[in-house]
């Protein structure tokens, strides 16, 4: 998973202030107000200290928590050809210091510090893994590692990450096929020019155990190696039976550290084994039925947080990821750099997990829960090659900073499921209760209250012969340019063209004495996407921008491993296109530009969404709209006090959700406009906010705390089931024992609040961990 951090020619790699991401207030008035508030601080920063313009400033904190929040001046993505301050997009960089201070141990942990991102849950067609939504749009396929798309459903780790970059808004000009919400770029650790060893050893409640190591060694003037290791084993606070363990290794070597030609070879391996969480079913919004819980209000059922509806001797999840990368670059001088990256990756996601399904209504009518078995056997492989040329030149008296590139990739997903013998997986009807005990019931149901996870569910598990293979081939060319007309005015433009082909094949198979014919589907789309942004700089440490961009989501966008799959209904349709507008501002204030403020107002429109048309066929006739505001802050008030946070408001509306069947008249199916027109996007809170701050009390003691707020989140477009709003508090304290050892205590969910953090299925909600306390020894030498 690792490769050399990439930056445009002449890029500055590190600086002590952070770019931020949170965009803006409603319209021009609020934007002007924000700028007015920031102006005095900005002017003070200019007169007091020119450090905000220094070419390279590296800050070393004096305490174990690395209290000074650090982030690069430029993105590690070489497609962003301007410093982050002058990039006309909302970009959030989560630096290593914030990841460490908050006690994050997974990608989803780290992303909770970024408002506007929500975590979805797995369901029948959607795999268990990192199901992410950005600005209301599904971004499941929009995760990249050092600029290369990372395919396959995974639960990603952070032990090998230097930082995490979140680009919000249309992402297709940068990454190809994608959603309108944005993308996530994971920046890997790579060999450095100094020797160091960093290690962590942590213990906590819920049987938490974790250890990591990060070792860098300089072999010669031009060669260095780096090795990252991780072991993790833990249960989940407040939840019965659920546990998981994983381990990973990530070595890398760089040749030519001080040469014009540099090559980095890296390998990443991570595998995990767990008993996955089942969550809690929703209370169906019925007007009748037994009042066994909060009858019919659409929230998750009112049972103890520890309630587990799964089966210990049936449920499991095993994953494995292997990624190898060769990154070669040559510096011709005069800021001209040629780079080529070749990567091969393979991942597997194999599971049986219990979805506490409420679709039959038995939860409310009879007080029983169907233990629906969601299963998957998936292997995904991908090979990609990316070549880019970046540099600077003068033309017509204007300075150009550009990147040109070519990308080729092939992705293949093989997906199947499990068959259980004996057993039916759907014994329920809407009119009869579901037996919950006795061998003849096969234990496919459980009582709503006090289910027995150790029910003796006996079966033989085999892989279904119905195996789907999806192959996706993509060819892309792109170009980006930042044109500096004057020191105050810049224009950022970019365009990308993609040739996208995807095929689905299901060979003929026989199951239960029934033969199913082979199925073959194909889609071929070409699409161009662009982005353009005009930047005005009131001062050297501020910018105001307006930008416009597009994105395309073709049929089969998920590559065969998600909900946006290829089917006969969509294979002949055009890509869904989104157009987005953003007005924002960024300021680096206080001496040295050590505190970053940002704000933006944005609007995204999709006017050819795939929905059911009046004739019952799927067509590109639907429409969606998201309007929103983001605010962000990151950096340091003083050398002792750091901060990282933001706020996002999203008004996400399904304007035209197509048509629904209303019955059959004279043999003809009748359709009417969807009753869900005008509803809020599912998995999209209207308001979300996050704030983390740390303060160094003495050279040896640092304390910190965080607050996360997420508004009500609907589980489906029907808007009748939802996870309630919640506020979570976290705390941290660290103590420097010696020059080499620091102890850090993290308490997450300080008040032990019961809340639900994963919702994207209308059947159940994911239960967040209860109060979790961990004590970690950070060792450096």
PLM features: residue spans?
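Gram-negative outer-membrane beta-barrel transporters
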Residues: 598-605, 620-717, 751, 780
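Acidic, small-polar-rich N-terminal luminal/periplasmic segments of exported/outer-membrane proteins
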Residues: 3, 55-194, 583
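Acidic/polar loop-and-plug regions of large Gram-negative outer-membrane beta-barrel proteins
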Residues: 232-237, 244, 249-331, 348-380, ...
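Outer-membrane beta-barrel translocator/receptor signature
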Residues: 159-162, 173-249, 257-262, 322, ...
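Structural signature of Gram-negative outer-membrane beta-barrels, strongest in the C-terminal barrel
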Residues: 254-258, 380, 399-411, 468-604, ...
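Face-selective signature of the C-terminal outer-membrane beta-barrel domain
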Residues: 324-345, 374-506
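Membrane-embedded beta-barrel scaffold of Gram-negative outer-membrane proteins
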Residues: 329-343, 347-353, 545, 574-658
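C-terminal beta-signal and adjacent terminal beta-strands/loops
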Residues: 708-716, 734-781
